[in-house]
Amino acid sequence: MSKEKFERSKPHVNVGTIGHVDHGKTTLTAAITTVLAKTYGGSARAFDQIDNAPEEKARGITINTSHVEYDTPSRHYAHVDCPGHADYVKNMITGAAQMDGAILVVAATDGPMPQTREHILLGRQVGVPFIIVFMNKCDMVDDEELLELVEMEVRELLSAYDFPGDDLPVVRGSALKALEGEAEWEAKIIELAGYLDSYIPEPERAIDKPFLLPIEDVFSISGRGTVVTGRVERGIVKVGEEVEIVGIKDTVKSTCTGVEMFRKLLDEGRAGENVGVLLRGIKREDIERGQVLAKPGSIKPHTKFDSEVYILSKEEGGRHTPFFKGYRPQFYFRTTDVTGTIELPEGVEMVMPGDNVNMVVTLIHPIAMDDGLRFAIREGGRTVGAGVVAKVIA
């Protein structure tokens, strides 16, 4: 088949497989691409092509991730699969592969296992909004009651972590049999794809969200005022609109009196563009890198939050020694470092390089943040960890 041109017309949705080791995540990924290619067109990806995942760097952390793409009649999917448990943890915490929804793979022969639980918890903490369950290896279980029992266990586990366990879709299938072309099991893959289409809503595009620009630099231009530069993270800013400067200091209002890109004047700056924004009545010394420019009322500054963190191993260039509760590193948000203190969970005395841990962080300056914001943990400019804001506290 010749390479089709990339269809921008279909909504684009990011998904991924999560679940315990050897429950069949990669086999399912291969089965989805194969069955959907056969049914709706597109190209299949073999198991071994998916399993030897290339390394990527996200926030200075090496992660092995496989990306595959597939289509249903109504959508285009980008799907991420990781070979190892540690890769999942890193992937979910760094947000290297943001997921609009996840397929939780549980082997019917085993039921939920420790990593099943851990991936569900991580999904909750990092804000994976929707989970669909694929009960795999159902061809190996003859007892209908056993299947009922496993499904019930999985639903209860999801409910325990605040997912709608009673209502979310559960598909009973066999990835291997589907991959081998057995029609009754291929039908289960089509059923799963149907749930991807119907259960995961179309994600809101960055351009439709409220305006936010992390400030990278500040200049004053004589006779014109103060210009801040940076890449618009989301939304649109139009000339004449009110904006807020949020973080580090008290929040200040201003008006955008001009937008420039490559020395040209524009009417607006949009998500993804590197722009300069001219601000009315603001002095150069009133603004600094690390603040954000945002739609008024859309984001607030905070100093205290609950987070999920991955600490780099020595081999990844991280610390060589554990840290304890008095640890005071820098937390790097968007464009700047802010010092913070940490509280570890009860019973956790120290954190080893290579661990992932839940911690409450208190920053010495407020930073504009929402749940789901990613950050790096640094010591003297060197990245030693990555984290995500699970919940803002104050």
UniProtKB/Swiss-Prot annotation:
| Residues bound to Mg(2+) | 26
- Positions of GTP binding: 19-26, 81-85, 136-139
* Pfam families reported for this sequence: GTP_EFTU (PF00009), GTP_EFTU_D2 (PF03144), GTP_EFTU_D3 (PF03143)
Instruction: Give the UniProt subcellular location, in the record's own words.
Output: Cytoplasm
UniProt keywords, alphabetically: Cytoplasm, Elongation factor, GTP-binding, Hydrolase, Magnesium, Metal-binding, Nucleotide-binding, Protein biosynthesis
Q: What is its EC number?
A: 3.6.5.3
Q: Where is this region: G3?
A: 81-84
Which reactions does this protein catalyse?
A: GTP + H2O = GDP + phosphate + H(+)
| Gene3D superfamilies, per database record | P-loop containing nucleotide triphosphate hydrolases, Translation factors
Region G4: start-end pairs? 136-139
Q: What InterPro entries does this protein's entry cite? A: EF-Tu_GTP-bd, EF-Tu_GTPase, EFTu-like_2, EFTU_2, G_TR_CS, P-loop_NTPase, Small_GTP-bd, T_Tr_GTP-bd_dom
Subunit structure of this chain's protein: Monomer.
Write out the function statement from the record: GTP hydrolase that promotes the GTP-dependent binding of aminoacyl-tRNA to the A-site of ribosomes during protein biosynthesis.
Name of the protein described by the UniProt record: Elongation factor Tu 2
Organism for this UniProt entry: Serratia proteamaculans (strain 568)
